């Protein structure tokens, strides 16, 4: 037996194991079948959680649950128990101290989702009558999403294809993680404070329930509900539903579908305009024909046909001119609108912007090259001046005038008394050096 290891009592050993289980392992989620469920008068619940090959004792204390919580749980039922491991010291049995129980298959997150969904639905946040109508032709569209994700690219490409003249404002936010809900709320508040957008898109790509959990935040749902600007959700894929989808004024299956929902199609607008012009022209023709019929009817009734015909023909000519003028003005007005749309579409052509940027870049390169040359010349001149100054004050320059430097053992001598007869000294000249022996010392 090793003398270096302490000898423990059973109580001490169990206490150490209990401390390790409680402090090192942390919260666990365990799925299994309830067995040996006991509900004593103390209000605590005790049961065994087992699978086909193993089991663990569980304790669900009164202060952790409501009195009616386990009424629907019985022996043989599959559950997921969440809690921390501990040790019952008296018998040396480790056990799970349960903090929460849900039915197996539902999952903790799904249960929270359903509870919040029921709560908000009971408050009327999902009611169709409180949802705002989307604008038919928005001038400015706000996008709340990650600026680096795939969703933003899908949205921007769809907007550029369907309605390129719309202005777009991006309100960046994280869409996953602990800080994402608050950032999404802040972006919604900022967009409402700006009052520049007619509609907002709240979007992110697909993912698991954990990835999309930021959009199941209660505070975010309430912020969507009180938004003065209509909110369109485009979260995940077609089968994904979040609390934000239920509260939003319109739920789109994907970010691309959200961009489609908030924009008209330019081609459809032109078709509508063409149809309106055709209908107006048809109405004018019908009106003229109707007036002609009335005129013919009156001609048959009047006693003086020529005078009556002349009067009504003048009236008919006047009305015809007025109708043709009104039709022409309407057509010209819509042609101007089409020209404006065409000009705006041409201005948004990226090729023109790229050429402008190229010219600006070339000018900047030429300017930078000139400035670098000037700076290098200045540094060269300064270096030459410094070298001249250093040479003037250098001890080696003094040697050029016939002076010498005397040293012994690599130490410079300043007085004759620093050397003794027989010493070997070194004399440094402007060119070369001399090794000399001291034969005489004079003051």
UniProtKB/Swiss-Prot annotation:
It catalyses: Exonucleolytic cleavage in either 5'- to 3'- or 3'- to 5'-direction to yield nucleoside 5'-phosphates. Its EC number is 3.1.11.6. GO terms for cellular component: cytoplasm; exodeoxyribonuclease VII complex. GO terms for biological process: DNA catabolic process. Disulfide bonds: none annotated. GO terms for molecular function: exodeoxyribonuclease VII activity; nucleic acid binding. Keywords: Cytoplasm, Exonuclease, Hydrolase, Nuclease. InterPro entries: Exonuc_VII_L, Exonuc_VII_lsu_C, NA-bd_OB-fold, OB-fold_nuc-bd_dom. It is found in: Cytoplasm. Belongs to the XseA family. Bidirectionally degrades single-stranded DNA into large acid-insoluble oligonucleotides, which are then degraded further into small acid-soluble oligonucleotides. Heterooligomer composed of large and small subunits. This is Exodeoxyribonuclease 7 large subunit. It comes from Legionella pneumophila (strain Corby). The gene is xseA.
